[in-house]
Amino acid sequence: MAKKITFNEDARRGLERGLNTLADTVKVTLGPRGRNVVLEKKWGAPVITNDGVTIAKEIELDDPYEKIGAELVKEVAKKTDDVAGDGTTTSVVLAQAMVREGLKNVAAGADPISLRRGIEKSVAAVSKALLTSAKEVETEAEIAACASISAGDPQIGDIIAQALEKVGKEGVVTVEESNTFGTELEITEGMRFDKGYLSAYFVTDAERQETVFENPYILICDSKISSVKDLLPVVDKVIQSGKQLLIIAEDVDGEALATLVVNKIRGIFKSVAVKAPGFGDRRKMMLQDIAVLTGGQVISEEVGLKLENATLDLLGRARKVVVSKDETTIVDGAGSSDQIAGRVSQIRKELENSDSDYDREKLQERLAKLSGGVAVIRSGAATEVELKERKHRIEDAVRNAKAAVEEGIVAGGGAALLQSGTSALKDLQLTSEEAVGRNIVRSAIEAPLRQISLNAGLEPGVVVGKVSSLPQGHGLDASTGEYVDMLSRGISDPVKVTRSALENAASIAGLFLTTEAVVAEKPEPKPAPGPADPGAGMDF
């Protein structure tokens, strides 16, 4: 297909038009007085949201150059959202400000490469200053304050703080839709996976239809168990120890399953068999996780271990095991804390190197099961539109709160970015050409506060001047129009959110400024309509 190529200033301005269209749509949502945007859907009800990345994803432009410009800025919003769970609108506002000022300087004859270098050095200095000024999040109330700002609802903030208090910063907090009104929290203790008992005869608690064992042995096997001859030696050893047995294997069937069931019914020996979670390589990894957690070993011929030769020291242990029809929970595995920490570190490295959203999600789940736990927040609403919007807000607020716990918090409302940034840039030593890049960043760090005050109906220039003269950490409470100590008022941003927004905006601004040509698809001319059928509509 033929391509359309544009060079120099025309190329950059085409990209900027797309950026501005997207940014102007997104930035109206910034701050406590930000407005909503309604998104039409091809199917179902429209969505009402004030989340920057959700709005950005929906925008598709006709002009090929504008479309490319908009897509580049979508990446800024998406990357910030992935890393920090919030700050998407801030990152778009910062990118727009940097590109606008940068293109003015390029048009006036500035060297784009020196500009980009100046921007990168300036942003690194501001990021360092933000990290230095960050305050650690130590109390549940501080976590709740961060989550409340992101979600726009103090009740949601409190629930998220409770969830993180229970599962820790490595734990998984999932958000599900509920059929009832309100928001509720459910905490899962220990490691849980979605596989239940292979026979209802294993049940020990008839009322709850669950198998509950205290201090059982846990046999972990990566192959199918059908022959009772293979299973009998290890079962005999467990019977002699007077304990119960949980068997996790690829499958347990035939005479092996029948023997276990008969022994349970006759009261000779209590056991329960479940299928291993996952598939393929992921199953092997999850079995290894269970082995590390319980202090056992995976019985696998790949490592020279056979089921018929298994001894008690190869089996895992746990304080409690609960198995229902659909899931298995292992509480307080007896694995060594050093081995668990090593496994957690290994999974975290895989997480950092993974590009796939699906793989990252599964790795995060494994990490949580090993190191923290799982909390489920169930949210309900009156309409489907409200439910989707509320669920999305809670998901963002969870990531926001985790970011706060990870790197600490700074004054919100654009105050920390302006104050820390201004002082950091003042002392930065740059060449004369790079200093122009510093001026671009200095102008851009005012942009979020300007937009927040504009959305609140205030005069941006006056607000920026006032906040610049206030002590560090003081700023504008846009919901009331007062100038206050932001952290004591509970108005804060996770430093990771502010830092990610600034760094991602600078990255895309550098690409815009150093672009000399844009190659786009040439729109195909629409075929002319064919001649009308002269006989159409006539009745013969």
From Swiss-Prot:
It catalyses: ATP + H2O + a folded polypeptide = ADP + phosphate + an unfolded polypeptide. Transmembrane segments: none annotated. InterPro entries: Chaperonin_Cpn60_CS, Cpn60/GroEL, Cpn60/GroEL/TCP-1, GroEL-like_apical_dom_sf, GROEL-like_equatorial_sf, TCP-1-like_intermed_sf. Keywords: ATP-binding, Chaperone, Cytoplasm, Isomerase, Nucleotide-binding, Stress response. GO terms for cellular component: cytoplasm. Its EC number is 5.6.1.7. Gene3D superfamilies: GroEL, GroEL-like equatorial domain, TCP-1-like chaperonin intermediate domain. The keyword Nucleotide-binding applies. One of its GO terms (biological process) is protein refolding. It comes from the Bacteria. Signal peptide: none annotated. The keyword Nucleotide-binding applies. Residues 520-540 are annotated as: Disordered. GO terms for molecular function: ATP binding; ATP-dependent protein folding chaperone; isomerase activity; unfolded protein binding. Pfam families: Cpn60_TCP1 (PF00118). It is found in: Cytoplasm. ATP binds at residues 29-32, 86-90, 413, 493. It is an enzyme of class 5 (isomerase). Belongs to the chaperonin (HSP60) family. Forms a cylinder of 14 subunits composed of two heptameric rings stacked back-to-back. Interacts with the co-chaperonin GroES. Together with its co-chaperonin GroES, plays an essential role in assisting protein folding. The GroEL-GroES system forms a nano-cage that allows encapsulation of the non-native substrate proteins and provides a physical environment optimized to promote and accelerate protein folding. PANTHER family: 60 KDA HEAT SHOCK PROTEIN, MITOCHONDRIAL (PTHR45633). This is Chaperonin GroEL. The lineage of its organism: Bacteria, Bacillati, Actinomycetota, Actinomycetes, Micrococcales.
